[in-house]
Amino acid sequence: MQTATSIILETLATGMDLAPELAEAGFSRLMDGEMTCAQAGSFLMGLRMKGETPQELTEAVRAALARAVRVTGIDGPTIDIVGTGGDGRSSFNCSTATALTLAGMGHRVVKHGNRAVSSSCGAADAVEGLGLPLELDPEDVRALVAQRNFAFLFAPRFHPAFRNVMPIRRELGVRTLFNLLGPLLNPARPSHMLLGVARAELLPLMARTLLLTGVRRAAVVHGAGGYDELTPMGPAHIMLLEGDGQGHGTLTEISVDPADYGIASCTPEELAVPDRDTAVRVLRELLSGGGPAPMRDMLMLNVGMALHLLEPGLALPDAMAAARLALAAGAGGKVLHA
């Protein structure tokens, strides 16, 4: 008699997509430690080889959130600024700078993240370096959002079930669905998201998954130069999402050209930081209204896109203009001293 796991593996071996109930069973068994290492590795590689679908990724999100420490009780719209990583760039932590700038402008930000993946300084490293609290409980998150419009949710603290997955990921040593899953698992369930991907082919997969998991408004971004953020290096390819929170909505493809906003192109070296200390110093400069011009331009592009999502009716050119003014005024620095 076939077990559920053997049925799942046989389905993947034939190159077929998993039905929702099979996907849910597979991810539940994986996260509960009920698969052997051989089964877990076969499961993850089978998904990768055939190509993960939005429905399969959605079932992975649901299984992970069912086992997560959830954060509730934050009223009104909230946003997360996050990327999949894997762009191979040691760029400054633009997502954290964007999040803090938005918080300084009065928007509620619940940033979910971890240590560095492809940069010199990951979101958690940056938050820690700026002196902001890292090890938070749900009550702390609610209090900090009320106090300063910003809280950081350190992923390992909120996803204990991932301890069953990490050894398998390390042994495999290759990209799996879990490289995409992290940005989708914010336990505070923000209504808005600015999500970056390092590969353009991931745009529809991630956008459709956000829609299915209940996000109301989002932009999934692939930046010029292969970055998982908008950059001054050239036009960004973007999928805009308008959802009803119940899995239904529309997706629209757009392109955003920095030249339209008076931004000069730059090189990857002008966006890079060599180490954590430099990364934190640059962040402080940017949040105070200074910093290197190419990094400031990149920050403006991402803040502007997020404002376009958060403020209904705010056209993108007006959002970019508002972002420029906020950066010049050092809006993000207010959060550090709240």
Swiss-Prot record:
Recorded metabolic or biological pathway in which this protein acts:
Amino-acid biosynthesis; L-tryptophan biosynthesis; L-tryptophan from chorismate: step 2/5
**Gene Ontology cellular component annotations, sorted alphabetically:** cytosol
Tell me its EC number(s), please.
Answer: 2.4.2.18
Q: Where does anthranilate 2 bind?
A: R169
Where on this chain does Mg(2+) 2 bind? D228, E229
What superkingdom does the record give? Answer: Bacteria
* Annotated binding of anthranilate 1, by residue: G83, N114
Q: Which residues form a coiled coil?
A: none
Q: Which GO terms describe its biological process?
A: L-tryptophan biosynthetic process
GO MF terms, alphabetically ordered: anthranilate phosphoribosyltransferase activity; magnesium ion binding
Give the enzyme's main class according to its UniProt record, as a single word: transferase
Q: Could you say which residues bind Mg(2+) 1 here?
A: S95, E229
What's its job?
Answer: Catalyzes the transfer of the phosphoribosyl group of 5-phosphorylribose-1-pyrophosphate (PRPP) to anthranilate to yield N-(5'-phosphoribosyl)-anthranilate (PRA).
Record family assignment = Belongs to the anthranilate phosphoribosyltransferase family.
Classification via PANTHER family = ANTHRANILATE PHOSPHORIBOSYLTRANSFERASE
Know the name of this protein?
Answer: Anthranilate phosphoribosyltransferase
